[in-house]
Amino acid sequence: MKYLPFFILLFAFALPEANAQGTRLLRQPTISSESIVFVYANDLWKVSRQGGDAVRLTTDEGHESLPHFSHDENWIAFTAQYEGNTDVYIIPAEGGSPKRLTWHPGGDYVQGWTPEGEIVFRSSRESRPTQTNKMYKVSFEGGLPEALEIPRAAFGEISPDGEYIAYVPITFWDPEWRNYRGGQAMPIWIVDRKTKE
């Protein structure tokens, strides 16, 4: 009992410090002219660029990740794992019901948008037995995905004018350290979509 006042005093000083640290593990932000959408607790959240309270956009029990605003900022494409499958979904930027765009049993991971409003994603759907990823695009309305002109890509995005693709050709087995120059360094390749060079 003689230590009880000490622990009460310690707790009284530690509690405000814990609250002052704020929310942690906000991940994968995508930024528009007015808003920021990010992943927290496996859901998508949206907040004004000026700050304020964040609003939850998705509430499904699944895992949402990799949000990307469309170029007109009216839609958000994201990857979600609902009912055990990882696919591409879109949702209005103001919130609403997610719409599923891909149906392949392999994982489909959103990378961005084309200037024409198609969603770009990576998948290993055509690469058996090596599991090499390729980039695909799918219409905003849905339909069959179409492979992009590069043979393999683990991560990448199309330039805003649609003329170039910047990508990393292979996945890494371990996250890299900043300024790392060893054999696991991931080169970024840039390809002109017209000349294929």
Question: Which residues are covered by each model-predicted region?
Answer:
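Blade-terminus and WD-like Trp-Asp/Gly-His loop motifs, strongest in beta-propeller folds
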Residues: 30-33, 67-75, 111-118, 156-164
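Beta-propeller domains with acidic blade repeats across secreted/periplasmic ectodomains
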Residues: 56-57
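Short, ordered coil/turn segments that flank beta-strands lining enzyme active or ligand-binding pockets
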Residues: 49-52, 71-72, 93-94, 115, ...
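Bacterial N-terminal signal peptides
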Residues: 5-14
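A flexible loop/linker signature enriched in serine peptidases of the S9 family
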Residues: 20-21, 39-45, 60-64, 77-89, ...
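Mature N-terminal segment immediately following signal peptide/propeptide cleavage
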Residues: 22-49
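Bacterial Sec-dependent signal peptides at the C-terminal "C-region" and cleavage site
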Residues: 13-23
